[in-house]
Amino acid sequence: MTKNSLKTGPDELGYYGEGENAMGGIAVGETLMPALHELNQGFEEAIKDKKFLDEYAYYCKHYIGRPSPLYYAENLTKKLGGAKIFFKQEHLNHTGSHKINNSLFQVLLAKRMGKKYLLCESGAGQHCSATAAVAAKFGLPLVGIMGDVDIQRVNQNIIKAKHYGAKLKAVPGTLKEAITEAIKTWTTDPDSAYICGSVVSAHPFPKIVAFAQSIIGREIREQSLEQEGKIPDMIIGCVGGGSNFAGAIYEFLDDKNVVKIGVEADETAALSNGTTGIMQGMKTYLLQSEDGAKSLGGNSLGAGIQYFGVGPLHSYLHDQKAVTYTSATDAEILNAYKIIAKYEGISSALEPMAAAAHLIKIAKDKPKDFLICLSLCGRGEKDLDTLEQHIGKDFE
């Protein structure tokens, strides 16, 4: 890896980049520092341990069902004209999304570090149900923390998490409040492990989650070379905190000819409409008041991309102009869902349909040998009630 590689990751203090424009860091109180240092040390030791990495690889294959397919969306390609479109089918993983890649890695890490029980937060409920499944597999108790607003609309994931043995705790609000509560609880008990669900929060969480999710991009490279004889010309994915998209593009950060496009929800587009600030242990782009005293944010139909900030890696890549970030409205997301369902027979989660909405806009203008890979990071069961409410009549 070259010195100026974008894949070098954060420095020892958790910063991506240098100087006053660096993103990330460890902006937390002294009470949290010992736990973060312990976690970072445990992570660095684990990724040098072949036995640990082999165990992770074993369960990725035999428990999650990896590698997930790289699927040629032939009907959609013909419908749109132009680019040849592929889906990285993360929705076919056990528990229905990319989230389990990270849950498995961090639960194995917690087990290696001798932790007795687990904490996690979730917005769409997908991280909670995935972590609950892995916790059940390895016999560790789990407390899942979610905002009461999100719980009301993703009840299927909540039911699954309970079936796996998780205890659910509701806090007023959405994902932001759930993360805050999970971190606060973690600081009170050294026997606990906080399983962070995205590339957010204080160092080393963004680094750990990006490492776990980078399996997505490594598979994309291998599968695209095998199937098409070349790597994708473009990779596109949705961005809330940003873990699935980070995983999809991490392998390609030094491939300057690969166009990378992250798509936020229009109502909560921190990279498009936010400013830099410090919140939840990290410096990043945030939707915040003018004085930075409080966070702001709207509502999105995709609970997993309804986040007032974004992971610091994405803020850094945005400022470096290494990745393009844009946004999609709820109406565009719903339209993309209808198109994918009709032409490919796939009921997707709403979150990746933000990326699909942008893909639908641009694919027709690309040549036929231009390969676009969409990270289809979740399945749609959790959103069926919302979909029926908003567009149910369109299918009659």
Question: Across the structure, where does each feature detected by a protein language model lie?
Answer:
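Active-site-proximal loop->helix
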Residues: 117-119, 127-183, 270-279, 383-392
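Alpha-helix C-terminal capping segments
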Residues: 104-115, 129-141, 249-256, 357-366
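Active-site/ligand-binding loops adjacent to catalytic centers
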Residues: 176-179, 183-204, 228, 254-257, ...
